[in-house]
Amino acid sequence: MASNLVVARGGVEFVPPISLAFWRWTVVFLILLPFTYVTLKNNFHIIKKEYKKLFFLGSMGCGVCGAFPFLAGETTTVTNMGIIYTSSPVFIILISYFFFQEKINLTKVIGLIACLIGVFVIIIKGDIDLLINLRFTIGDLWMLAAAIGWALYSIYLFYWNSELKIFERFTLISFFGALSLLPFYIGEEIFYKQT
């Protein structure tokens, strides 16, 4: 996650954010495809059954979580991005509770609080002034959406069983992720003005 946020903050100065996400997942798909092509071809009947779920996973995991941090990087800081992204476990617990009736117990709450405190301390390097002086921007909303997207991806990846092996499944998730970004990539290529 940390390297992704650094790329999000620095990379958008050189490459438009949607392009960065689109090409990232396109390259991932092209790298994986030679290793999974035969299996995917043999399991095409499974892909036909599961493509809607795979598209959703690709849209959340590669589209929302791939592009939104890069969009956020245009207007917010790496510190803000890191702090907001750590809210993902909160959303995972809440969504699992409301939609999958998974119980929230004291152990989960304590673990979550300890995790969030630890991440906050690392991100702000123990400097409370840094936390007090945080300023929020539109980029923070992009990061909040990315955190929710990651939560949805994580939950449905866990709950949706697949007949495909994980390597083949991830190949298709990267494909559908790039596909979900394609119309936005085309729009960005047409309308984006480098500043």
Predicted segments with their positions:
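Hydrophobic residues within membrane-embedded alpha-helical segments of Major Facilitator Superfamily
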Residues: 7, 27, 56, 60-64, ...
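Hydrophobic transmembrane alpha-helices of multi-pass small-molecule transport proteins
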Residues: 32, 107-126, 181
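Specific alpha-helical transmembrane segments that line the substrate/conduction pathway
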Residues: 19-30, 66-108, 146
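Membrane-interface helix termini and inter-helical loops of multi-pass transporters
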Residues: 6-17, 44, 73-74, 78, ...
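Helix-helix packing/entry segments at the starts of transmembrane helices
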Residues: 21-23, 62, 66-67, 80-87, ...
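Specific transmembrane alpha-helical segments of multi-pass solute transporters/efflux pumps
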Residues: 1-5, 33-85, 121
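Glycine-/small-residue-enriched transmembrane alpha-helix faces in small-molecule transporters
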Residues: 1-22, 132-159, 179-184
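Cytoplasmic-side transmembrane-helix entry/capping segments in multi-pass membrane proteins
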Residues: 49-58, 104-117, 164-174
